[in-house]
């Protein structure tokens, strides 16, 4: 089990079913030391208003020894790589994830998806790309892995993609993991929980990584300090409350 989970949704995304308190309780039960709440960006139909993201600043950083990161799963909106996270949202959040979602960016062709994803990474706003192995959004996998390594953006292996969403992602995700390994980039694991019961669930992710002998030293979830060092290298101010995580 890894002590860090980087992708989950609360009732603020109304197709999810758990609260911040639910996730804290489950993290304590499972030994998760650090997690990120990453509700959908405002361009999704059932997403929270942008005030929700700006107001995350009122959250405590640490509850009963569990660290809480303030995040978003933003939407890649167009071929220029624009995302629905800007202005005060960017400065209020610790973790900016970006990905394709059909209601915002209808599937097109491999070249268009690749160009949009690389543009989002090149913008400097994004720390992590969500579910890049989605078969509905094929991409040039070596090209995105090389770009991710160049721009220091993690590519996600998403456990939900093998269980309840984006079925048929396995082959793409194995290829992505191998390409990231070869490019010297970072992988991030996300449960993509829409209920707290699956917090920290990475069983299927682990199978993908094992299949390509992915190196542990390039997985951000191995420890809170590794993830925090990565975010700080990307410009996030050090968070004093997390010093002992």
Curated annotation (Swiss-Prot):
Zn(2+) 2 binds at residues 15, 40, 194. InterPro entries: Phosphatase_YcdX_put, PHP_dom, PHP_phosphatase, Pol/His_phosphatase_N, Pol/histidinol_Pase-like. The keyword Hydrolase applies. Zn(2+) 3 binds at residues 73, 101, 131. One of its GO terms (biological process) is bacterial-type flagellum-dependent swarming motility. Zn(2+) 1 binds at residues 7, 9, 73, 192. Its cofactor is Zn(2+). One of its GO terms (cellular component) is cytosol. Homotrimer. This is Probable phosphatase KPN78578_10290. It comes from Klebsiella pneumoniae subsp. pneumoniae (strain ATCC 700721 / MGH 78578).
């Amino acid at each position: 089990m890894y002590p860090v989970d980087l992708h989950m949704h609360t009732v603020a995304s109304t197709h999810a079913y758990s609260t911040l308190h639910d996730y804290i309780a489950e993290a304590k039960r499972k030994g998760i030391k650090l997690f990120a709440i990453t509700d959908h960006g405002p361009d999704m139909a059932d997403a929270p208003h942008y005030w929700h993201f700006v107001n995350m600043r009122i959250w405590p950083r640490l509850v009963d020894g569990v660290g809480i990161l303030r995040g978003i799963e933003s939407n890649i909106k167009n071929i220029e790589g624009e995302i629905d996270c800007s202005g005060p949202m960017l400065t209020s959040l610790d973790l900016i994830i970006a990905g394709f979602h059909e209601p915002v960016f209808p599937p097109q062709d491999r070249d268009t998806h690749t160009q949009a994803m690389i543009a989002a990474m090149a913008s400097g706003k994004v720390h992590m790309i969500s579910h890049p192995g989605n078969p509905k959004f094929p991409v040039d996998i070596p090209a995105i892995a090389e770009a991710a390594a160049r721009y220091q953006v993690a590519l996600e292996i998403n456990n939900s993609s093998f269980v309840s969403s984006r079925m048929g992602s396995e082959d793409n995700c194995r290829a992505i993991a191998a390409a990231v390994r070869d490019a010297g980039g970072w992988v991030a694991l996300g449960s993509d929980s829409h209920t707290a019961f699956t917090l920290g669930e990475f069983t299927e992710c682990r199978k993908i990584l094992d299949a390509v002998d992915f190196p542990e030293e390039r997985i951000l979830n191995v420890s809170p300090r590794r993830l925090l060092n990565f975010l700080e290298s990307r410009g996030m101010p050090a968070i004093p409350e997390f010093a002992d995580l």
